[in-house]
Amino acid sequence: EPAQWMTVGGTYEERHYSPLNEVNRDTVSRLGLSWFADYDTNLSQQGTPLYIDGVIYVSTAWSKVYAYDARTGAQLWQYDPQTPKEIAIKVCCGIVNRGIAAYEGKIYLGTLDGYLVAINAKTGQEEWRKLTVDADKQYTVTSAPRVIKGQVVIGNSGSEFGVRGY
């Protein structure tokens, strides 16, 4: 469906393009602020929001995820993975999260401390989590997961500290 934005690039093909045409040269001047959300941090917000079936999903610093009613801005739920603050010493370039992915009723999140987490998109409840890095090394995860042919793929960070990519 054209109005959905299910991953960082919009579609699973990562086109970074919306075919919708309601906003154009003639209508752009009529745009205004409908609502906004404040977060409990002043750290950088780098993730692309997702829009699915009337809900906006946003990831923020410390790997938190929020769901909002797109029309009203009402917060539907918040997920906090309780990322340990001590992980900050392993991070070179900011306590950030660069996005989430959605697939078949779940929101997928890579946490700063290296977990891949599946969150129920309707309730915000954690369904499962899996450690994806060697916790004894200087790994972190800041990138958005991708879904490819039903498989969730996540990369790691930490090259500044001599860890290997895999």
Show the residue positions of the predicted features:
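Aromatic (tryptophan-biased) beta-strands that constitute blades/sheets of beta-rich domains
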Residues: 1-39, 74-89, 125-134
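Repeat-blade elements of multi-bladed beta-propeller folds
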Residues: 2-9, 44-64, 89-115, 140-161
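N-terminal export/assembly segments and adjacent metallocofactor-ligating motifs
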Residues: 31, 43, 66, 72-73, ...
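Structural motif
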Residues: 162-166
